[in-house]
Regions:
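Extended serine/threonine-enriched, polar tracts that run as long, contiguous segments within proteins
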Residues: 61-151
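OB-fold ssDNA-binding interfaces and closely related basic DNA-contact patches used
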Residues: 1-87, 151-167
Length: 170
């Protein structure tokens, strides 16, 4: 976590901008070492997983990069067509996650939103997963989400201690 992500001074950011604004092409290339790698995360519900059937129906924290973020933005603000909020509990579209390897790195180019809207599914009295509807008790949905969602506090910003500042300033 860089302190600049919450508006605090950062020696990493200072070094990045010093190198980036340099007239030296070598320094500008070195700036890439200090540039940020954007990552995002959200809660998702696994609808189908052929490799891990036990994950189906579970709510997990999904961490992703810029490629998936751009796909989400295209759903929210499409160049043509109707916008769709993929996070809508009733009308969110299914996201088909297809990960391939390109030059040894995970590639998400083949992942896409499917035209089919899929609501959140919760277990009924018998444990069978059933889709929620507008008539589903909101308190039931809230309780399900609260009790079954991943703990996101471990992903919160972590303040640097003096050891971290000392290490970065070496």
């Amino acid at each position: 976590d860089c302190p600049s992500s919450i508006g605090k001074p950062s020696p990493l950011q200072d070094t990045y901008w010093k190198l980036k604004k340099s007239e030296s092409v070598q320094d500008q290339k070195k700036a890439d070492i200090f540039s940020r790698r954007h990552s995002f995360s959200c809660l998702i519900q696994v609808i189908k997983d052929d490799h891990n059937k036990e994950l189906e129906g579970k709510i997990l924290n999904f961490r992703f990069g810029i490629k998936v973020w751009e796909k989400i933005q295209s759903e929210l603000k499409p160049p043509i067509g109707e916008p769709n909020n993929p996070f809508d509990l009733l009308k969110g579209k299914l996201f088909s996650l297809k990960i391939t390897k390109v030059s040894g790195f995970n590639n998400y180019d083949q992942s896409k939103f499917v035209d089919k809207a899929i609501p959140l599914v919760i277990p009924d009295e018998k444990g069978k997963l059933v889709p929620i509807t507008e008539k589903t008790d909101k308190a039931l949905v809230f309780t399900f989400l609260k009790e079954h969602s991943a703990d996101l506090t471990k992903h919160a910003y972590k303040e640097w201690d003096q050891d971290t500042y000392n290490y970065v300033n070496q």
